[in-house]
Amino acid sequence: MSNVRYISNLTRETYALILAGGRGSRLHELTDWRAKPALYFGGKFRIIDFPLSNCINSGIRRVGVVTQYKSHSLIRHVMRGWGHFKKELGESVEILPASQRYSENWYQGTADAVFQNIDIIRHELPKYVMVLSGDHVYRMDYAGLLAAHAESGADMTVSCLEVPIAEAAGSFGVMEVDEEMRILGFEEKPQQPKHSPGNPEMCLASMGNYVFNTEFLFDQLKKDALNESSDRDFGKDIIPAIIEKHNVFAYPFKSAFPNEQAYWRDVGTLDSFWQANMELLSPTPALNLYDAKWPIWTFQEQLPPAKFVFDDDDRRGMALDSIVSGGCIISGATVRRSVLFNEVRVCSYSLVEDSVVLPDVVVLRHCKIKNAILDRGCIIPEGMVIGYNHDHDRAKGFRVSEKGVTLVTRDMLGLPVGYE
């Protein structure tokens, strides 16, 4: 019981800041009208729901969401889905756009995004500040990270995981540690990452999740703000500057529950986004969205149940090995191994396979679609074939990924744009 109380005290003394202003440029047109944290995932969620749910499930009830790029849909989603917290009980989820309080600039980097909100953080009087990436899909008990930080006497703790060197090159901050997990070296997105101890194929990559002692964080941010050559970034500037003279430790990422494999996905490319959604269709997926022990919270629209209509031999409405969300109608069509978000309509004689279909999409009659991502609000013309011939897809103006996933957006179809 004392350990439970200890963890509870730590989480109550923590303010979490989720950095949710990223564009996600490797997702191409999929993030033309929304920030990456606002991107849909898993049939009904948005990416921002995962770090927010981790906070709530970990007992952290004071959260700020830092926004910048194309933030309208993100702000609207957080206000609708996360506005039920009670300030009188010490709970809050606040939206923190760039205030330009200390300069006329927007957020210049991850460290600057925190620096511009120092006054708001100070008002909360936290003992610890947790800085979290808002654009990854994962389950993590932040209480364990906090406990490790407090017990080690660290000034800063960096959450990390092992990543193949080829995958990490140019994409992740990479660290070197000693046997006590003290960070000895840190490089931001090196082209030739240094391997983990005893494992030449893997390296220790930063997850972009940090815990700081509050006053230590403030001191380092103020120093960085005076450095004219700084990029105002934790990975590029803050961490390399402090590892020699201060206690900076790594915390290995682990599952929220014993004997379960830890789950973390970057979903930063079209292929990884498609693959992570497809993984959810497994009978026992690595990310179990149905696990009541660690629920993923989100904004719940009031929609009717999904409906499957017609049962003729050549016109049967059915979905197999798929996720089909509220408001969907499968009308005499077949859906296989696909994720359908809310209010999707698939009309008679059409076939949708191995695809991710975002909200409000209409697939008209006699279409054949496979290995595709259909962006929100697309209306697929009658008889259109997508995903069967990549040259034909490109000729229609669609984007084909490195691994053969076809992205279709409203703009590519000649429809008015602006869906978020």
Curated annotation (Swiss-Prot):
Reaction catalyzed: alpha-D-glucose 1-phosphate + ATP + H(+) = ADP-alpha-D-glucose + diphosphate
InterPro entries per UniProt: ADP-Glc_PPase (IPR011831), ADP_Glu_pyroP_CS (IPR005836), GlgC_bac (IPR023049), GlmU/GlgC-like_hexapep (IPR056818), NTP_transferase_dom (IPR005835), Nucleotide-diphossugar_trans (IPR029044), Trimer_LpxA-like_sf (IPR011004)
Alphabetical list of Pfam families matching this protein: Hexapep_GlmU, NTP_transferase
Record EC number: 2.7.7.27
Gene Ontology BP annotations: glycogen biosynthetic process
Keywords on record: ATP-binding, Carbohydrate metabolism, Glycogen biosynthesis, Glycogen metabolism, Nucleotide-binding, Nucleotidyltransferase, Transferase
Residues the entry annotates as binding alpha-D-glucose 1-phosphate: Y107, G173, E188, K189, S206
Bilayer-spanning residue ranges: none
Enzyme class (EC, first level): transferase
Pathway(s) per entry: Glycan biosynthesis; glycogen biosynthesis
GO molecular function: ATP binding; glucose-1-phosphate adenylyltransferase activity
Subunit (UniProt): Homotetramer.
Reported function: Involved in the biosynthesis of ADP-glucose, a building block required for the elongation reactions to produce glycogen. Catalyzes the reaction between ATP and alpha-D-glucose 1-phosphate (G1P) to produce pyrophosphate and ADP-Glc.
Similarity-based family: Belongs to the bacterial/plant glucose-1-phosphate adenylyltransferase family.
Record-given protein name: Glucose-1-phosphate adenylyltransferase
Species in which this protein is naturally found: Shewanella baltica (strain OS185)
Lineage: Bacteria, Pseudomonadati, Pseudomonadota, Gammaproteobacteria, Alteromonadales
